[in-house]
Amino acid sequence: MLGRNTWKTSAFSFLVEQMWAPLWSRSMRPGRWCSQRSCAWQTSNNTLHPLWTVPVSVPGGTRQSPINIQWRDSVYDPQLKPLRVSYEAASCLYIWNTGYLFQVEFDDATEASGISGGPLENHYRLKQFHFHWGAVNEGGSEHTVDGHAYPAELHLVHWNSVKYQNYKEAVVGENGLAVIGVFLKLGAHHQTLQRLVDILPEIKHKDARAAMRPFDPSTLLPTCWDYWTYAGSLTTPPLTESVTWIIQKEPVEVAPSQLSAFRTLLFSALGEEEKMMVNNYRPLQPLMNRKVWASFQATNEGTRS
């Protein structure tokens, strides 16, 4: 599917292993590329990861992610509750290079770290968080706002511990996952992010892993808790439509040097031809008949930070 053996043994193998090979037994069919002007830069960039050089979606999929969020078209819902976030720093386990991105894993055996409230009816346990980024600062986020792509995007992935026994079940279950998305923009140095940046040289190659001291990921969240929410999917195979997305309106600032450090990682394993870990985002998907709900009312001010 990906063409070169080096890609098959790196990013693609990771995706299959992480998302459970049995799910790939479902037939996959080409999906249409996003036709919106908003994704022109992202999809015209010819250095997309090979996983996305051929459009892929799930058969009959109607709620694929990521999407372009039209600020003015989002619908204010006064019944949306504040999101409650409670993360236990000690539940942080390790950081590793998956072959597609770098990921920080958490102990999800208890309710110690998780979220509730917002658009969610149940408690969701934190499983992991990771980032997506581009080769250049003009794009790299998976979601966009009014056609604007940010340099990177943080995803905190949670699973419904009330309805399901474990993460694997939740991935394929209704209302199984909740993902908080946070945009990164260039600006001031981010002190907490630097803790991750300092470890990246230890996980340069695929499958490399490093221990983590206690880490509270709430320190990576913006100070403003306004958000958009919509029904979507995973943005990596198996692309299951089990995700409630919670996209924070306010981006967080990171220094250019910190984002550049992300680009020092490799898709490839030690001994393989080196492939820079950049452009690890999925192209935009059509909104179709979905609505994007907002926890805040639109104003006459600028549409983005």
Swiss-Prot record:
Catalytic activity: hydrogencarbonate + H(+) = CO2 + H2O
One function term, GO molecular function aspect: zinc ion binding
Annotated keywords: Disease variant, Lyase, Metal-binding, Mitochondrion, Transit peptide, Zinc
Binding, Zn(2+): H130, H132, H155
Cited SMART domains: Carb_anhydrase
Presequence range in chain numbering: 1-38
Record-linked Pfam families: Carb_anhydrase
Enzyme Commission number(s) from the entry: 4.2.1.1
The keyword Transit peptide is assigned to this record: yes
Cellular component GO terms, alphabetical: cytoplasm; mitochondrial matrix; mitochondrion
Keyword Lyase carried by entry: yes
InterPro entries from the UniProt entry: CA_dom (IPR001148), CA_dom_sf (IPR036398), Carbonic_anhydrase_a-class (IPR023561), Carbonic_anhydrase_a-class_CS (IPR018338)
Domain of life: Eukaryota
Gene3D superfamilies: Alpha carbonic anhydrase
Chief localization: mitochondrion
Domain Alpha-carbonic anhydrase: 39-296
Subcellular location: Mitochondrion
Means of activity regulation: Activated by L- and D-histidine. Activated by L- and D-phenylalanine. Activated by L-adrenaline. Inhibited by coumarins, sulfonamide derivatives such as acetazolamide and Foscarnet (phosphonoformate trisodium salt). Activated by histamine.
Enzyme class: lyase
Family, similarity comment: Belongs to the alpha-carbonic anhydrase family.
Function: Mitochondrial carbonic anhydrase that catalyzes the reversible conversion of carbon dioxide to bicarbonate/HCO3. Mitochondria are impermeable to HCO3, and thus this intramitochondrial carbonic anhydrase is pivotal in providing HCO3 for multiple mitochondrial enzymes that catalyze the formation of essential metabolites of intermediary metabolism in the urea and Krebs cycles.
PANTHER family: CARBONIC ANHYDRASE, CARBONIC ANHYDRASE 5A, MITOCHONDRIAL
Protein name listed in UniProt: Carbonic anhydrase 5A, mitochondrial
